[in-house]
């Protein structure tokens, strides 16, 4: 996906423009380090939601039909408008279909992979729901609280703001007590 040589040259150009001493020792290897950083941060750009669903399809048939809530999944992403950092707290709820549950470690992995793209917070929730739907789930709720550097650290500079988005599928769209049970579980 990434043309490593082009990226290294681009990083050198940026450093030459923003630093008065771009040749100093501390910056000598910075373009290569930036390449590794970008490859890690944007790894999710290499995969479609179908790919992600296939990667993390580890389900167990246990006969459960009870609500499952996982709170506090911590991820980072970058907004597509400024490439600014977004720090996200993601909460997922679902009702198992046909008694199948997804391995718990797969939820953070899915969240992490869809976050490793240039994104907007709303789409991250939609992408997580889409991946879970591809795994056969119907009743899904994704609640994301995000701190956006494009608001917190630049421009309007409002460091205390947190943006909440909800993505609802299935019963969560119309079952208010069920939706409230999830919202009440989020601290």
Stretches with model-predicted labels:
Residues 1-187:
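A domain-level signal for the structural core that forms small-molecule/cofactor-binding pockets
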């Amino acid at each position: 996906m990434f043309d490593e040589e082009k990226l290294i040259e681009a990083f050198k150009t940026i450093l030459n423009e923003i630093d008065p001493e771009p040749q100093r020792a501390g910056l000598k290897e910075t373009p290569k380090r930036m390449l590794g950083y970008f490859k890690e941060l944007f790894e999710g750009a290499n995969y479609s939601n179908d790919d992600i669903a296939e990667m993390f399809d580890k389900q167990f048939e246990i006969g459960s039909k009870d609500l499952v809530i996982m709170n506090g999944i911590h991820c980072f992403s970058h907004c597509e408008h400024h490439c600014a950092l977004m720090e996200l707290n993601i909460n997922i709820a679902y009702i198992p279909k046909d008694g199948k549950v997804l391995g718990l470690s797969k939820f953070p992995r899915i969240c992490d992979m869809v976050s490793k793209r240039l994104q907007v917070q709303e789409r991250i929730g939609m992408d997580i729901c889409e991946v879970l739907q591809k795994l056969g789930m119907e009743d899904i709720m994704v609640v994301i609280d995000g701190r956006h550097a494009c608001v917190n650290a630049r421009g309007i500079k409002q460091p205390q703001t947190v943006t909440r988005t909800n993505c609802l599928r299935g019963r969560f769209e119309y079952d208010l007590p069920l939706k409230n049970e999830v919202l009440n579980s989020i601290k």
